[in-house]
């Protein structure tokens, strides 16, 4: 497994706090309980067309696992887990089914990408959802202060283009925040402190992977 290989782990967002660095500056950090995960499957170019490892995370009552997944975990020789995801990589030779994946894989990593599901906001207007400025407060405005305004053109094209920014359901999207600094790792507690905010609620499931841009080892 090369030094620049993509590494990843599933975890739970516990919340935010702040710590002090070596120069006594306050650093806002997100606390993530990362792993431990277990490798439940290995995909290779020969069998699947690409290289990846499948990792499983989180406790679950075996009675709540459906039969296909029960058989999948039984074949791998691991106890059923609640969450499963794949981490694509160029070389999977350093992994084997049943191997534990812990937060220690990030010991030499400086920057990571974090993927999670953002907080759902429900149905929201265009000002909240897209940051529209709104319309004038006076000068003949008839109760349209927060409305979108004109959304069409003329007889040609005679329709509203797809993707037009309007009111609608906001949040609950899968989002990746890139190039976040790894501030500290506590291997004994399976904790990783990541500088800044990451997507999602407290208790949300996130995927932490080595940064694909900017150099994870920078």
UniProtKB/Swiss-Prot annotation:
Task: List the SUPFAM superfamilies.
Answer: Translation proteins (SSF50447)
UniProt GO MF annotations: rRNA binding; structural constituent of ribosome
Gene3D superfamilies assigned to the protein according to its UniProt record, in alphabetical order: 3.30.160.810, Translation factors
Recorded GO CC terms: cytosolic large ribosomal subunit
Q: Which InterPro entries match?
A: Ribosomal_uL3, Ribosomal_uL3_bac/org-type, Ribosomal_uL3_CS, Transl_B-barrel_sf
- GO BP of this protein: translation
Function, as annotated? One of the primary rRNA binding proteins, it binds directly near the 3'-end of the 23S rRNA, where it nucleates assembly of the 50S subunit.
Family named by the database record: Belongs to the universal ribosomal protein uL3 family.
Record's protein name: Large ribosomal subunit protein uL3
Name the source organism: Corynebacterium glutamicum (strain ATCC 13032 / DSM 20300 / JCM 1318 / BCRC 11384 / CCUG 27702 / LMG 3730 / NBRC 12168 / NCIMB 10025 / NRRL B-2784 / 534)
